[in-house]
């Protein structure tokens, strides 16, 4: 990649994160490697964390337009799609800019043969109406709309069926969430232990 490329840095970090974990360490290393500063550094970081925060939703939408699924794609192409869709849906980046830059990234990562697929999938995915989605059950709905793992979605559905989606979406928006333990189902301490085990809270 020649010159500052915050989108490319975000995609490269996402590829490594999916393979190795430790998101903050990987992102910091990629930002240093590409010598990104100021707005470029902030933009790359925003893309990276927006993808991680909304990955369940992003993957569901993209999968509607990928008959063979996301898992069959090259890692770089998969992350290019996620990053572009995240920009258009959650970061107020114009759809045309998100798509055009994603197509450019296929060349940057030597995946030019995927440029047509990236262009076609994104143009449809960006306009996808989640409100029209039909889910198998409430757990799948929570997983997609709340971008939650299955264990988290099951736990919240069982213990907080009326509040589960609000809990997930408010947490994603950075708001504060208060929970009250149901004394008929357990103690506050037991609830805290379960939430810690599911990485829903941190102490």
Predicted regions and their residues:
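Class I Rossmann-like S-adenosyl-L-methionine
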Residues: 1-200
């Amino acid at each position: 990649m020649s010159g500052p490329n915050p989108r490319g840095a975000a995609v490269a970090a996402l590829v490594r994160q999916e393979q190795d974990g430790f998101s903050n360490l990987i992102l910091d290393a990629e930002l240093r490697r590409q010598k990104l500063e100021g707005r470029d550094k902030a933009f790359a970081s925003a893309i990276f964390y927006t993808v991680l925060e909304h990955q369940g939703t992003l993957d569901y939408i993209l999968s509607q337009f990928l008959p063979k699924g996301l898992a069959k794609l090259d890692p770089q192409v998969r992350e290019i799609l996620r990053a572009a869709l995240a920009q258009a849906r959650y970061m107020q980046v114009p759809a045309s800019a998100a798509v055009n830059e994603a197509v450019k990234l296929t060349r940057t990562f030597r995946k030019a043969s995927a440029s047509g697929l990236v262009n076609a999938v994104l143009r449809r995915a960006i306009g996808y109406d989640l409100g029209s989605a039909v889910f198998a059950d409430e757990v799948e709905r929570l997983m997609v709309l709340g971008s939650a793992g299955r264990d988290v979605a099951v736990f919240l559905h069982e213990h907080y069926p009326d509040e589960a989606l609000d809990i997930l979406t408010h947490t994603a928006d950075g708001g504060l969430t208060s929970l009250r333990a149901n004394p008929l189902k357990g103690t506050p301490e037991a609830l805290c232990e379960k939430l810690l085990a599911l990485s829903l809270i941190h102490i």
